[in-house]
Amino acid sequence: MVQVPKTRKTYCKKCNSHTNHKVSQYKKSKESTHAQGRRRYDMKQSGFGGQTKPIFRKKAKTTKKVALKFDCTTCKTKRVIPIKRCKTIVFMDITQIKKAKVNKKDPNW
């Protein structure tokens, strides 16, 4: 489990300074039906003949690389930065993360 702060002060190229950024997880958008590859695949699939391309079934990885989306609060510029592989990601306030670190050091925790 990875704990990530909801806001982070980091460099913004457009503002040319360190500003506050809102951090969220990047989600894949809906695929376009007008893309050339999608149109080609749909034409190939139509009509008689069944499945034309192999369906991939050998899954090697158990996790995906998480991508974080940074939104600048002043100029609204967005950028996406990947981090390491992890099963779960939790967005917390900085104070909650600091409390969690202090509690881990406590032997009674």
UniProtKB/Swiss-Prot annotation:
Cross-referenced Pfam families: Ribosomal_L44 (PF00935)
What residue spans carry the Basic and acidic residues bias annotation?
28-43
Any single GO CC term annotated in Swiss-Prot or TrEMBL for this entry = ribonucleoprotein complex
Q: Is this entry keyworded Ribonucleoprotein?
A: yes
User: Can you say where in the cell this protein is located?
Assistant: Cytoplasm
Q: Which keywords does this Swiss-Prot/TrEMBL entry list?
A: Cytoplasm, Ribonucleoprotein, Ribosomal protein
Family listed:
Belongs to the eukaryotic ribosomal protein eL42 family.
The protein in question is named Large ribosomal subunit protein eL42
Q: Which gene encodes it?
A: RPL36A
